[in-house]
A protein has these predicted regions:
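Targeting-peptide/extracellular-domain and disordered-appendage signature
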Residues: 2-13, 17-157
Length: 157
């Protein structure tokens, strides 16, 4: 299997992050998670084709990079994007990833996570701008395997 095909397979499980752009019925909402006192922002994600750069040993290896730019939807509207990168630390696809959610006319939310191939990712919210200038919290990204997924960001009050 070629590097690009392998990168596509890995990236499908990578994150905030990374399959063929496909449209399906979008859904998203913003609500309160009363059990933890956090405000939850939920988005339908349309993953893009990732860009894979093989910088280390040929094939997956330390120093390889994947960059992504995905669309975030709320209802039937695109409300922002998710952009970022993952740097591989070994041939298994274990990666250090970081990204930024940009919500149109609202600001940004920065996040980071350790990536492995499972479709469920746990994110740390590390900051933001605009309406999210004091953003802290955590979140999840779940990939559906069809080029779509769900991003949930739980912001501390």
């Amino acid at each position: 299997m070629g590097n690009m095909a392998r990168a596509g397979g890995w990236a499908a499980s990578a994150a905030v992050v990374l399959l063929l752009l496909q449209g399906s019925a979008p859904s998203a909402s913003a609500d309160d998670d009363h059990s933890q006192g956090k405000r939850a922002l939920t988005f339908h994600v349309l993953f893009s084709d990732p860009s894979y750069t093989d910088l280390g040993t040929p094939g997956f290896s330390a120093a390889d990079v994947i960059v992504f730019h995905d669309q975030l939807q709320q209802g039937t509207q695109t409300v922002g994007d998710e952009v970022g990168s993952c740097v591989m630390v070994d041939e298994t696809g274990l990666s250090n990833c970081s990204g930024v959610v940009q919500l149109t006319n609202r600001g940004t939310i920065a996040f980071s996570f350790v990536n492995l191939p499972p479709p469920h990712k746990v994110l740390a919210i590390t900051g933001g701008s605009g309406q999210f200038a004091t953003a802290r919290g955590d979140g999840t990204l779940d990939e559906n395997g069809d080029g779509t997924g769900t991003l949930v960001l739980k912001l501390q009050p």
